[in-house]
């Protein structure tokens, strides 16, 4: 028998071997032999690898994705005290106002929120580990330019129930907007301010959009800084003209319903929350992070005149019924910025302290040193230098060459 025959391994056996490897090692193996290169780019193997990694997630390394707002560099680091770099990817969208979201190893990018005259409605997906980039088909709502919309919103996430990545695009066209609502006028009411919104939903599996129209929507503005996608539902922070009225908007891709969730009344009284609302995934739900400075705390607060961080978790009590539970409330020392930079894989919030990072234990509420001297850049308390989120590896998009 020839030596070459001894070297040959059946494809099924190779799949069983390669599915156990991290993405970076799979890609290295794909460069060794042409047949392996083709194998790891098949949808069957990508699905096989993904399923195995999920089954062994409890023993696999945990990662964090650091998004540097200054350099637009994406760095994947190990979620441990050393926080060593695993890989990095620099991208240039030509604008500091680029919208960004990540879920299950893929990153969604868009410039549609840029107010420059040359409106760019493109939405793209990026796999930073595989260095693969996919431009999505134009959203059916891209016909509404920046000047033709009252507000727009994007969300991106992985829906494990259907094993699909989803983009939700919502537009409130000026042509359907209600007249200006004056909360102090006895002649105006929120019912008079109802308007129609257009909703586009993209599926990566089908590489297509569907369009939905919903009437009787009454949110005047949607925060575009941060969105959350959990269990097939997208969440944003919304505002009405009366600045004391803040809410969480959600779109359920299973039912195609756009709805609202009230936030605890006192949250909206803190000025900081109106400027920088922050919601993040929290297990199978979402958490609202309330950063309270000493100047906007109330006298009946336990930590009055002391900066503190509150975490409220959304509870789904029953169908169409939601409530909030305070998960944690901790005082923040003077040398720690109250701005949350992200969360670790265990849910502990990450905050900046000079050039280092600290976390707060969700069980003990005690601060812990996380990373020393992570960056040579000094921390500007008004502008976080990083946003940090849990990250998992994926081979998705590696097969796009086969589709083109």
Predicted features and spans:
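N-terminal entry/capping and adjacent linker segments that precede and initiate structured domains
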Residues: 1-404
């Amino acid at each position: 028998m020839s030596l070459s025959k001894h070297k040959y391994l059946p494809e099924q056996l190779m799949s069983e071997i390669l599915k156990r490897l991290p993405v970076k090692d799979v890609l290295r193996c794909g460069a060794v032999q042409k047949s392996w290169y083709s194998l790891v780019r098949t949808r069957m193997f990508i699905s096989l690898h993904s399923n195995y990694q999920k089954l062994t997630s409890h023993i696999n390394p945990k990662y964090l994705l650091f998004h540097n707002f200054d350099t637009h560099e994406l760095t994947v680091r190990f979620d441990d005290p050393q926080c060593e770099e695993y890989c990095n990817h620099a991208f240039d969208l030509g604008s500091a106002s680029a919208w960004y979201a990540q879920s299950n190893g893929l990153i969604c990018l868009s410039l549609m929120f840029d107010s420059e005259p040359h409106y760019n409605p493109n939405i793209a997906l990026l796999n930073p580990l595989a260095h693969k980039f996919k431009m999505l088909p134009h959203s059916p709502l891209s016909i509404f330019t920046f000047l033709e919309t009252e507000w727009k919103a994007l969300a991106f996430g992985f829906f494990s129930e259907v094993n699909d990545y989803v983009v939700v695009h919502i537009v409130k066209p000026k042509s359907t907007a209600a007249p200006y609502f004056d909360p102090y006028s006895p002649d105006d009411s929120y019912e008079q301010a109802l308007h129609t919104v257009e909703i586009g939903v993209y599926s990566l599996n089908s590489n297509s959009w569907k369009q939905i129209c919903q009437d009787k929507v009454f949110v005047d503005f949607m925060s575009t800084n941060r969105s959350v996608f959990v269990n097939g539902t997208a969440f944003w922070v919304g505002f009405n003209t009366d600045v004391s009225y803040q809410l969480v908007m959600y779109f359920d891709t299973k039912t195609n319903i756009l709805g609202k969730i009230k936030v605890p009344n006192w949250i909206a009284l803190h000025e900081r929350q109106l400027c920088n609302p922050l919601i993040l995934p929290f297990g199978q739900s979402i958490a609202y992070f309330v950063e309270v400075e000493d100047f906007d705390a109330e006298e009946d607060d336990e930590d009055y005149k002391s900066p503190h961080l509150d975490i409220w978790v959304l509870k789904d009590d029953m169908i169409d019924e939601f409530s909030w539970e305070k998960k944690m409330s901790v005082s923040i020392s003077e040398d720690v910025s109250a701005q949350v930079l992200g969360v670790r894989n265990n849910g502990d919030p990450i905050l900046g302290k000079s050039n280092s990072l600290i976390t707060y234990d969700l069980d003990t509420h005690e601060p812990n040193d996380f990373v020393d001297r992570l960056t040579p850049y000094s921390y500007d308390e008004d502008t976080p230098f990083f946003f940090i989120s849990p990250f998992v590896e994926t081979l998705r998009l590696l097969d796009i060459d086969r589709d083109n």
